[in-house]
Amino acid sequence: MQQYEKLFSEGQIGTVQLKNRVVMSPMVLGTGGLDGTPGEQMMQYYEERAKGGVGLIITEATRVDEKHGPLAPRQLAMSKDRHIEPFAKMVKRIHRHGAKVFCQLHHPGRQNLSLLVGTWRLSEAIGRHWHGYWDIFFKVAQHADMVEKTGLLPPVVAPSPVPCRLQKQKTRALKTAEIKELVREFGAAAKRVQLAGADGVELHGAHGYLIQEFLSPYTNRRTDEYGGSFDNRMRFITEIIAEIRRQCGADFPIIARISVDEFYREIGDPADEGITLDEGIRIAKRLEECGIDAIDVSSATYETMNYWLEPTSFQTGWRSYLAKTVKQNVSIPVLAANLIRSPEQAEQQLKEGIQDFISLGRPLLADPDWANKAKAGRPEEIRRCICCLWCFESMLDGAVRNRPGQCAVNPRTCREVGIPKEPKKDGDGRIVAIVGAGVSGVKGVVERRENAMKEEYQKFIAPVI
């Protein structure tokens, strides 16, 4: 009998059948090409997780707009027709292993840098013809705050001129015509995803990005058709959904990822500031009425990011009540990444009806074979995420230094091309001194099979994790 019967049962999102309930959650890690296409590194990164047994991969936040929509230099894009063919190649490689592919469509809104808004289109055009330009670009990017202070760059965009308290960028309100153009761009990007052979799309309406900024009364203070009342604040996302249906048809699945609680009260703001859970439930129910196929439950914004990123101090499954409450109020499938640390926890949350699909982000950075090991009844072999957030910190630093993110417990993450999964056992009887018998040192001895002389000031190995 399968140890995790519910976790490895089939599931369905819209018209798409999934082989199990394990979903790779979208994460931007800087493995894309500077032209918005997936190169060999990104393809191997995703393919390894597909080989590892997940049922669905939702790709990283993918930009739909080149004017003010780039989030990072090495971010996926589906804003141009030239992005279709490279994306299709990646989709085929993922499909080869039985996993489905959804593409997350994204616009950063106010949570962006003026440097990208002001220079990206020109930089991308120059960089395609003169690769040496990127050395200059990334040197400047490392001093983005100083460049911003010159006042020469255009502001970032949002529903209303409410700056992000973390990014602290000049912010302007989108014009009505610009909003309508963005609706068309989301639809066009979804059509490109469909033409590339992917199985569906996810709209990124969480973590404080543009779609969420329209939904939230904190960031949306407009007085026109796109602001004010609940119906008006819902208009942007509902028009995007309608446009995707128009361009892609009724059978092309759409997931909406939403922050059902922004947690502004936790940083000293009024208790009813922004989106609270009651408002999040209203949003989820309205999205179901609009015909989306699943809700991906998340929380918070850049200003409250601990309630989204969940550092080490947060309790396992602490926000499962958010997904459970949404599931009690909608009839479509619910996905959620609820700080899930083990297959046992995942199975239990499915059995309790907290959610329908288990979204894993960092756990799949730590161990791409998480699903296969769980299915084979070998959960003790899973390399566990320690929630240190090095993946996030290294991604932010790498974004301005032209290098991908990293994982503290898996050196191959985002380096699958350069580091083989099964390194050559080349000890050949040599004696190698390993200074420090911590996790990394001991792991190196085991994997490379040298005759090692370990030096550790403690009297036992692996003293610190």
What are these regions (language model features)?
Residues 1-465:
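Flavin-dependent oxidoreductase catalytic cores
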